Amino acid sequence: MELAKMSDMTKLHQAVAAGDYSLVKKILKKGLCDPNYKDVDWNDRTPLHWAAIKGQMEVIRLLIEYGARPCLVTSVGWTPAHFAAEAGHLNILKTLHALHAAIDAPDFFGDTPKRIAQIYGQKACVAFLEKAEPECQDHRCAAQQKGLPLDERDEDWDAKKRELELSLPSLNQNMNKKNKKSRGPTRPSNTKGRRV
């Protein structure tokens, strides 16, 4: 991907997408860019999403060290784990899991990273996620029992998801339309002028 096509992305997004570890580190050290900034022109991807897409394990560790949140999602609810699963980046999934990222989070359509890996035929990722998902759930339960906070919620996504849900026609409306079509055209009921 050319940097010219990413003109609206932050310098950090650009450096991560280009795979320039040294520049990423320099930008983070200087505090020039927010590691959690969502680029609306790229479906709300953060630098961490780009690192997962590109399979850049060291960049992921660096971003998280500087405060990047693995729970942040794109405009359709994809976490960095979804992108890693799609591309078959097993080491990225392992790194995210080791950092206690919620690798079992569903997107807007209910697809988890494991389901994405299944769709794209990433068998090694599927096998790993089948073992890792219960561990992720166990960690979540243990943290809850101990009263430890977990960073698994994207507050912006909660509002955006509700907006998306409201913008889609409801299932009942779709069913009513299907039923009307299957019955054929309806005739107006005019019982007043009709002889019995």
UniProtKB/Swiss-Prot annotation:
Sorted UniProt keywords: ANK repeat, Repeat
Designated name of the protein: Ankyrin repeat domain-containing protein 66
ANK repeat placement: 7-37, 43-72, 76-105
Gene3D superfamilies noted in UniProt: Ankyrin repeat-containing domain
PANTHER family listed in its UniProt record: ANK_REP_REGION DOMAIN-CONTAINING PROTEIN (PTHR24201), ANKYRIN REPEAT DOMAIN-CONTAINING PROTEIN 66 (PTHR24201:SF15)
Disulfide bonds: none
Superkingdom, natural source: Eukaryota
Compositional bias annotation for Polar residues: 187-196
